[in-house]
């Protein structure tokens, strides 16, 4: 499992997956080429079969009556008309995968006549009149022309055999139907063209020249209605005699109109007529029939399909079915698009399996049982998509899958949070087992590193209870979702597996209660394909506009500096809220519960909307939330509060995000904890680092406070990730520091500043190793960076007088001898001083910058506005009303109301001639506890009353305002209402946290009071001894004694041993006794011979040190030389510090314990041991600076 945690191994797995996808595509292309060759061979066979049938019908056909024989000049179409007929004969079989029910023998004879008329006589045995322009064509020539004809012609001739029966197509085609019934024309006629474009009927077979634009669609729809069980079974019976009668009398109807056309070139007029009348050609828009001709055409079609009533009824049935089909299809598209837009990034659930004999038989049985044997098999939402349909979509999505894998590889090669996976591994109870089912003829993606052995005998049962639609969904528990192509069943072998199995078991029971047709469809669900979301749609989900953005529009008045600041601040706040609200949708790692809901609903969206799918989606959502909420969290202190906020509205999400930003700007640790618990940011150091660098609304000062806190390991990891995101290559030291300080304000306590500068210097050394080689010690970079910060503060601080500021010579003199006694090159120091003098080192603008600009434009301001948590919301021009029942002049009481997130500041404009300030301060009212209501009377149409409690009393301050228009008042009220709700909820959270802190303090004080009893009153009692031991153990556990900052001392104390009646110890020169068993190994562990009678001491006893002693790491030869000196120094130190070691209770036999409680020393900040710490290769660089400021040998 540890190999999974390696970033290169993860990248290799992604590359293997990408290779498998490429091989998949190559195999699919090879399969398509084979099927194209198969189609061409079938076309040749069908043309030969049609020709033999035509000859057979010509032999059986009686000689037509003399009056109905067409004149010798009657043209016949070109011999190439056979190809569309053959192609269309293949299309109903292979493109649609269905057969039309067989009809009696008269339609068979009619079909023979229909095929016989447009084709010339290939043999001399058939005695039919021919025109001088026509020549007999051999079957081989026709077959050659079929091969030369492009494949795009098959769609244009798709309706030549629409009304032909299967019996006329030969028995050879019927025997091959189960093998190729789902084959699509991949390159000549896609499924969309076959589904949406009605084909033209054979114009060349009818001498009347009328187009079958409506007739073709009518014929297709009649066939569909017959296959669907509609009450139109009389249509073939009525249609066949009419068509047979019309074909036996070809010149009776169309001779009046077709006569002038035949006077021209007979080989070109009929194709031209077909082009003019067919609506699928561009010529249809250039030539339109007159109203009389259209009416006559409709009348002829009605007569052709059995009369007016029969054709009207059939047309109504067809139109109703088609409209219902279009509505359901559009609704399915809309639902799929909405679900796809909510899916997280980098998720591509792709399940493809090659068709087997069982799947084809099941599909055929489904079609026969549902009565859908005659419908064109398009991509209808009620039918399961087949493998042939997935070929085209796999080709379209291949580029998206490659891009998704590229992003996954980039994420794996970047700084990866190993601690999440480590906690997942150490918990031991969360193991996911993947059972990859081999697919027929298609290589599945096998991820060896993700496989683990079954943890129990119940894994197989649980795997069987999981449906296939949720196999990729449970992968969200790994926080790293890749493209899944092969079918997978994942069983959860953890404590939550029982709840998952129960939820999904209920779903399975619900699925078994559905009808047989639905069971068959679900049984064939392995061939279904979940729709994939393009990366472009996933990157930018739609986010509603913020309320603050709506309130950005202000009333038209003279522009001022503060108003421009307000507009800029409001626009920035709108961007912050949109980023915060949309971040939970973008960050797939944070809102796994929401994503599980979307994935389960999207997997069920390919089926029809039924109650079973809704129940399954709800059950899967609960099961997945149970799995993911039980996973160990990295930084979430309370896992019960880390639930996905999927039920909250968009307004509540934005409010919670702003509350999280306010908490961060007040207390960074609490703010990060709140944002992680609400799912806005991931609980990994790299996720928090990206949040601090990219999101707006965070105070630069508080970012520095958070990153400079070296007491928490999580903060140190985040700082490492932050500096790793910055590139300082080929940059001067001051310019790199300027880039670093643009994101993080380096100020505050010296320890935090030192921590930030140390991390910066380490990163700069990594990016510029050639610069570091110029110095004798890499610590020179740290010293020089610190000197630049001091120079910038000295040069631009307003508290330092100009005559006392640091000059260039002072700066050079202060840096003398810092490079291990050597001076830094003068030109380097001069360049740094000049660049700092030209431009100040300062952070980028944040929300506090706008508040500061407003504060500087106000005169008489007593309240401090510039606070890290204060944010400007909007500014409105209102008019203060002293008495709501009296009319007053509005111009005399004009007020500029600035609404902050926790404060309402009321100002009035200053005269420009009298003062350089813009505003004069009037009032500042807090929003906590504020109530407001709108009023309207005969004097003021748009009024508002604000009531705020006064501090220290029960009275309330009441203010009345009115606005000129309703729009401005409405926007102000909306912002005010949201700000009051925000500050109220923030206060509730603060009170809850304060109560928790006080309860924790009371618990600790009670424990300490019980442990630190009166030592004089309980000096010799056993209870005092037990309490002293308990207090000592608690101190050890709370102090976190480490080998890096505490010295492991020995159990030797001569003075205490004599006082307590212990045996006399050996002389001071003798080595001390051995250490008690300690779980932490010490590098300086010595093994001298033990004393004869050592006193019994508790195993965790330590001697408190009064100063921090560095641990010196030596190699074996040096350790052998230093061993006598170290033992002598330790023994001397033990004898000299025995008085100060009395704080540790060492008990002798039969003597009372003298307990002197002293607080333990606080541990110093640990050394900066980053994985990418720069270690120079030179032999001269033998010293390194640690975070505590001291140096030690390496």
Curated annotation (Swiss-Prot):
Keywords: Coiled coil, Cytoplasm, Phosphoprotein, Synapse. Transmembrane segments: none annotated. The modification Phosphoserine is found at residue 255. Expressed in brain. Localized to dendrites, as well as somas of neuronal cells. CDD domains: bZIP, PH_IQSEC, Sec7. PROSITE patterns: IQ, SEC7. The keyword Transcription does not apply. Residues 311-340 form the IQ domain. GO terms for cellular component: cytoplasm; GABA-ergic synapse; glycinergic synapse; inhibitory synapse; postsynaptic density; postsynaptic membrane; postsynaptic specialization of symmetric synapse. Residues 1024-1035 have a biased composition (Basic and acidic residues). GO terms for biological process: actin cytoskeleton organization; activation of GTPase activity; postsynapse organization; regulation of ARF protein signal transduction; regulation of small GTPase mediated signal transduction. Residues 852-985 form the PH domain. Residues 122-133, 1036-1052 have a biased composition (Polar residues). Residues 79-92, 561-572, 600-610 have a biased composition (Low complexity). Residues 63-78, 1064-1099, 1159-1169 have a biased composition (Pro residues). Pfam families: IQ_SEC7_PH, Sec7. It is found in: Cytoplasm; Postsynaptic density. InterPro entries: IQSEC_PH (IPR033742), PH-like_dom_sf (IPR011993), Sec7_C_sf (IPR023394), Sec7_dom (IPR000904), Sec7_dom_sf (IPR035999). SUPFAM superfamilies: PH domain-like, Sec7 domain. Belongs to the BRAG family. Interacts with DLG1 and DLG4. Interacts with GPHN. This is IQ motif and SEC7 domain-containing protein 3.
């Amino acid at each position: 499992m540890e190999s999974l945690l390696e970033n290169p191994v993860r990248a290799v797995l992604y590359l293997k997956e990408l290779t498998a996808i490429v091989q998949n595509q190559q195999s699919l292309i090879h399969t398509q080429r084979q099927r194209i060759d198969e189609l061409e061979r079938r076309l040749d066979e069908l043309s030969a079969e049609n020709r033999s049938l035509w000859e057979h019908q010509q032999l059986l056909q009686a000689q037509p009556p003399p009056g109905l024989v067409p004149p010798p000049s009657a043209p016949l179409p070109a011999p190439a008309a056979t190809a569309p007929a053959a192609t269309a004969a293949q299309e109903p079989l292979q493109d649609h995968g269905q057969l039309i029910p067989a009809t009696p023998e008269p339609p068979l004879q009619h079909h023979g006549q229909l095929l016989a008329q447009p084709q010339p006589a290939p043999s001399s045995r058939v005695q039919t009149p021919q025109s001088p322009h026509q020549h007999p064509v051999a079957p081989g020539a026709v077959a050659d022309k079929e091969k030369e004809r492009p494949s795009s012609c098959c769609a244009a001739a798709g309706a030549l055999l629409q009304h032909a029966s299967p019996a006329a197509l030969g028995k050879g085609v019927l025997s091959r139907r189960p093998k190729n019934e789902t084959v699509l024309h991949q390159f000549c006629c896609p499924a969309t063209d076959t589904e949406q474009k009605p084909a033209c009927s054979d114009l060349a077979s009818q001498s009347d020249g009328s187009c079958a634009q409506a007739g073709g669609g009518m014929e297709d729809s009649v066939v569909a209605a017959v296959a669907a069980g509609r009450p139109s079974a009389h249509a073939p019976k009525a249609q066949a005699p009419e068509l047979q009668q019309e074909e036996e009398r070809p010149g009776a109807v169309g001779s009046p109109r077709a006569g002038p056309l035949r006077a021209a070139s007979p080989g070109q007029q009929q194709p031209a007529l077909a082009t003019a009348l067919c609506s699928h050609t561009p010529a249809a828009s250039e030539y339109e029939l007159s109203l009389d001709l259209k009416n006559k055409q409709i009348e002829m079609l009605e007569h052709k399909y059995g009369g007016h009533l029969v054709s009207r009824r059939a047309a109504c049935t067809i139109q109703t079915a088609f409209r219902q089909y279009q509505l359901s299809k559009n609704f399915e598209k809309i639902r799929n698009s909405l679900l796809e837009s909510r899916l997280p990034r980098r998720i591509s659930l792709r399940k493809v399996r090659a068709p087997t004999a069982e799947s084809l038989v099941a599909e055929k049985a489904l079609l026969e049982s549902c009565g859908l044997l005659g419908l064109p098999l398009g991509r209808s939402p009620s039918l399961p998509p087949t493998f042939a349909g997935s070929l085209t979509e796999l080709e379209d999505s291949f580029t998206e899958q490659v891009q998704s894998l590229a992003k996954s590889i980039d994420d794996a090669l970047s700084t990866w949070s190993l601690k999440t996976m480590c906690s997942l591994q150490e918990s031991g109870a969360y193991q996911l087992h993947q059972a990859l089912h081999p697919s027929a003829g298609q290589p599945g993606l096998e991820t060896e590193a993700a496989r683990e052995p079954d943890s129990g005998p119940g894994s197989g049962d649980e795997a069987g209870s999981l449906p296939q639609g949720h196999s990729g969904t449970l992968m969200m528990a790994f926080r790293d979702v890749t493209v899944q192509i092969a079918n997978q069943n994942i069983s959860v072998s953890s404590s939550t597996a029982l709840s998952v199995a129960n939820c999904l078991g209920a779903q399975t029971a619900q699925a078994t209660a559905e009808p047989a047709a639905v069971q068959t469809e679900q049984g064939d669900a392995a061939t279904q394909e979940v729709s994939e979301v393009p990366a472009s749609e996933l990157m930018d989900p739609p986010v509603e506009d913020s309320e603050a953005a709506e309130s950005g529009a202000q009333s038209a008045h003279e522009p001022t500096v503060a108003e421009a600041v307000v507009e800029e601040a409001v626009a920035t706040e709108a961007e912050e809220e949109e980023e915060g609200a949309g971040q939970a949708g973008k960050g797939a790692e944070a809102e796994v519960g929401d994503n599980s809901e979307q994935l389960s609903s999207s997997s069920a969206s390919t089926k029809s909307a039924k109650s079973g799918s809704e129940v399954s989606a709800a059950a899967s959502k609960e099961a997945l939330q149970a799995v993911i909420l039980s996973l160990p969290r990295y930084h979430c202190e309370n896992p019960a509060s880390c639930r996905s906020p999927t039920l909250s509205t968009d307004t509540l999400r934005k409010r919670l995000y702003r509350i999280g930003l306010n908490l961060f700007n007040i207390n960074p640790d609490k703010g990060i904890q709140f944002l992680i618990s609400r799912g806005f940011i991931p609980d990994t150091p790299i996720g928090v680092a990206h949040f601090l660098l990219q999101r707006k609304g965070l105070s630069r000062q508080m970012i520095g406070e958070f990153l400079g806190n070296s007491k928490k390991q999580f903060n140190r990891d985040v700082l490492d990730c932050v500096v790793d995101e910055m590139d300082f290559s080929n940059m001067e030291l001051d310019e790199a520091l300027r880039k670093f300080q643009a994101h993080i304000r380096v100020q505050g306590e010296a320890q935090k500043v030192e921590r930030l500068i140390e991390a910066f210097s380490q990163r700069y050394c990594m990016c510029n190793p050639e610069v570091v080689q110029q110095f004798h010690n890499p610590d020179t970079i740290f010293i020089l960076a610190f000197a630049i910060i001091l120079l910038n503060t000295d040069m631009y601080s307003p508290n330092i007088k100009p005559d006392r500021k640091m000059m260039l010579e002072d700066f050079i003199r202060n840096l003398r001898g810092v490079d291990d006694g050597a001076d830094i090159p003068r030109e380097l120091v001069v360049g740094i001083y000049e660049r700092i003098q030209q431009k100040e080192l300062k952070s980028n603008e944040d929300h506090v910058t706008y508040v500061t600009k407003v504060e500087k434009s106000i005169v008489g301001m007593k309240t401090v506005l510039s606070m890290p948590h204060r944010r400007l919301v909007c500014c409105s021009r209102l008019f203060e009303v002293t008495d709501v029942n009296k009319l007053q002049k509005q111009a005399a009481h004009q007020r500029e109301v600035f609404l902050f997130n926790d404060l309402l500041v009321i100002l009035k404009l200053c005269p420009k001639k009298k003062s350089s300030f813009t505003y004069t301060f009037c009032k500042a009212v807090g929003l906590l506890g504020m109530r407001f209501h709108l009023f309207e009377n005969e004097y003021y149409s748009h009024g508002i009353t604000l009531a705020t409690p006064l501090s220290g009393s029960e009275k309330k301050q009441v203010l009345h305002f009115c606005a000129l228009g309703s729009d401005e008042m409405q926007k102000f009220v909306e912002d005010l209402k949201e700000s009051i709700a925000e500050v109220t909820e923030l206060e509730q959270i603060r009170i809850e946290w304060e109560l928790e802190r006080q309860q924790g303090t009371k618990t600790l004080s009670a424990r300490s009071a019980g442990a630190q009893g009166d030592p004089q009153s309980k000096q010799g009692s056993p209870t005092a001894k037990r309490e002293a031991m308990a207090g000592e153990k608690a101190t050890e556990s709370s102090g976190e004694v480490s080998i890096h900052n505490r010295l492991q001392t020995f159990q030797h104390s001569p003075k205490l041993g004599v006082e307590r009646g212990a045996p006399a110890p050996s002389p001071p020169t003798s080595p001390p006794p051995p250490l008690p068993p300690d779980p932490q190994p010490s590098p300086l562990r010595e093994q001298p011979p033990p004393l004869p009678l050592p006193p019994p001491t508790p195993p965790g006893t330590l001697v408190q040190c009064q100063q921090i002693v560095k641990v010196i790491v030596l190699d074996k030869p040096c350790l052998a030389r230093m061993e006598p000196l170290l033992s002598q120094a330790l023994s001397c130190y033990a004898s000299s510090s025995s008085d100060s070691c009395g704080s540790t209770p060492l008990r002798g036999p039969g003597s009372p314990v003298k307990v002197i409680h002293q607080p333990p020393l606080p541990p110093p900040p640990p050394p900066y041991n980053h994985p990418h710490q720069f270690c120079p290769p030179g032999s001269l660089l033998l010293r390194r600076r640690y975070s505590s400021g001291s140096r030690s040998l390496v």
